[in-house]
Amino acid sequence: MKNPPNYWAVVPAAGVGKRMGVAIPKQYLQLHGRTVIEQTLGRLCAHPQIQAVVVALGADDELWPTIQPTLLHQNKLLTTIGGAERCHSVYNGLLKLEDRASDDDWVLVHDAARPCLHHNDIDRLIATLADHPVGGLLGVPVADTMKRTNEQGEVIATVSRDNLWRAMTPQMFRYSLLKQALADALNANVMVTDEAAAIERAGHTPRMVECRADNIKITRPEDLTLAEMYLARQEEE
């Protein structure tokens, strides 16, 4: 009988978050008593099905050593050096797992600045994709009216929101498939902005799995306030 697949996670954390307008990378900002990345890693490491979490760090990251000694779940954490773009960091994270992961194992790639991920959403993603040959991602249906503009900022079209989703993370795919898809994209100098795009480019069809709307990514200063509220509310559930 074939062994069941293992689950691994990769967290690209080499970015600097320019839109936040702060002096330090956004993953090291304080949120609900800990740094953003500590909150994020805590969500992943606490899940019993995730074997280990690889954190892809910037080559000149001087802040990680200041929080690393006090991180929970030390036995689950691995680190590697990230790259110039998210796709480079994720690929390096996958390489770190080469001696651990089997081809059919699952890898969950999750944003370092998405600290409100709920345990139930990880459960839902794993359960929904358990028998899927490719994998998929968490997302939320678009609720707002969508507009397309020209380069001058003038509205040129209203885009139908039917079957339109906001892609979120984790994005979960088979280890070998994702590694090859990212390698092919990088070799073609295509800088995909998420893992699903690499899988789509390889000719596969990821599955969308609906998640909670509070699984936000911290991108702008006001997002910190919102994330603080969400984390406090989750503690009360």
Enumerate the predicted regions with their spans:
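Generic C-terminal helix-cap and adjacent flexible tail
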Residues: 2-5, 99-103, 230-237
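Acidic helix N-cap motif at the loop->helix transition within catalytic regions
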Residues: 62-68
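N-terminal glycine-rich phosphate-binding loop and ensuing alpha1 helix
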Residues: 2-62, 75
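Hydrophobic helical membrane-anchoring modules
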Residues: 215-237
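Residue-level signal for inorganic ion chemistry
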Residues: 11, 37, 93, 111, ...
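Conserved core of the sugar-phosphate nucleotidyltransferase
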Residues: 116-209, 237
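Short aromatic-hydrophobic micro-motifs that form the base-stacking/packing surface
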Residues: 106-110
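Short phosphate-binding loop-to-helix
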Residues: 70-105
